Amino acid sequence: MTLVMGPAALQAQTDVAASLYGSFRGTSNGNGTAESPSNPAGVMLEMRHISNPLVGYELNYSFNRSDEEYKGSVSTPQICTPNCVPAGNTVYQAVKANAHRVGADWFVSLSHLPVKPFALAGVGLLFISPDGGQSDVRGNTKPVFEYGAGVDWTVIPHLGLRFQYRGDLYHSPDLAKAFSSTNRFANTAKPMIGAYFRF
């Protein structure tokens, strides 16, 4: 048994990483509402463990602003004043918010190469919290499917750079109470660059 387990044990690796990213998502339209997000920068923290030459798991946390703009016909106009602004035949409302996301992924990596390509997929939860001082808004909690790919580049032993692209798939946020939900799926693209330390 020792002879069988020994090579696998030698491949076990754990690393921690921090990355900066841009968050890009298009406008969602549905049920008479157009929901337009900002495209903010964010930060992600990761912990990865790989226990054999190919497969491992990851836990991650990310934060970015999640300001939203809503435009359309309101279902209850009386609660839209003074938060909504007339825009032609429709009304407009901006909501300022923070987004926190936690996730868990499986990933496949060619960990024995100097430049290590990887691919990942997993699930998480997205918590969107409007800033204080705004009325007629609500927080959202959304389940998320995450996918991505990238490369780790070893600079010196135990330290390297991580270049990756990630996507988050989830239902579009509905933070403004006066507007109907678009009831659409949103896909957020996140190109990232970061650094890792491998134990």
Range-by-range predicted roles:
Residues 46-133, 142-143, 153, 188-199:
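Gram-negative (and chloroplast) outer-membrane scaffold detector with strong preference
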Residues 16-26, 30, 123-127, 168:
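Transmembrane beta-strand segments that form the barrel wall of outer-membrane beta-barrel proteins
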Residues 36-39, 142, 152-176, 180-188:
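Subset of outer-membrane beta-barrel
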Residues 15-19, 56-58, 118-120, 160-162:
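Residue-level detector of the transmembrane beta-barrel scaffold of outer-membrane proteins
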Residues 23-44, 140-142:
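Surface-exposed strand-loop-strand hairpins of Gram-negative outer-membrane beta-barrel proteins
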Residues 1-14:
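Cleavable N-terminal export/targeting peptides
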Residues 11-13, 146, 164:
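Glutamine-centric residue-chemistry signal
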Residues 28-34, 69-76, 129-137, 173-180:
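Outer-membrane beta-barrel translocator domains and adjoining extracellular loop/strand segments
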